Amino acid sequence: MGILNVTPDSFSDGGKYNNIDAALLHTKEMIEDGAHIIDIGGESTRPGYTMISDEEEIERVCPVIEKIKNEFDIPVSVDTYKSRVASAAITSGADLINDIWGLKYDDDMAAVISGSGLPCCIMHNRNNTDYSDFIKDLNKEMLESVNIALNAGIDRDKIIIDPGVGFGKEYIHNILCLRHLDEFCKLGYPVLLGTSRKSVIGLTLDLPKDERVEGTLVTTVIAVMNRCMFVRVHDVKQNYRTIKMTEGIYGRNSN
């Protein structure tokens, strides 16, 4: 899953692709580099981000969705936690909704997705880091999101889960997410891992965000070895080659 941030303020690439021509060029590059899905974000979710209105997010995202769907044959995911944005994105041609609040922020989100018949990715997130038993608590809270989806009528086979590295977690929690990826795969849903250039890598290696590719690639190997189905990344070419080499040695879904 290649990341396309059409924002002026995303933590890693804010301002690079927030016009349609630049977004289309980057999409073309990511497809050529091996991306199977393009994930479009119209609002930065970096630590300390400023929330924007539904209307502004729709204006950023929907024209890009329409252009990509007109010019390329690739599924488009939209990274939003707002039901109005999701509805507009679906109308514009989105193929998947990626909700960083696991359907818990907007009470209408699950119904919008259910009505569309599209798949969704539901990420673990919370407003504090006060865990009593981290992995147990995380699994419980992810399954709460899954139940919201199921109760809204979203098909079980259209649900993807994401442990939410970097969201509602301290450094050690992010490390534990990576150390125990197999626990999330045991829940019975496809798992997406998003670690690309994140602070857990920067803190481990003491490197700025533009020097975290190698650290990201290590987490991608871990994802493949633990049967994750998706990795959400900025550096598509390097990650695609890493996945291909890992699968060449161990086979696809080797565990």
Q: Where do the protein language model's features map onto the residues?
A:
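Conserved Motif II region of HX4D acyltransferases
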Residues: 164
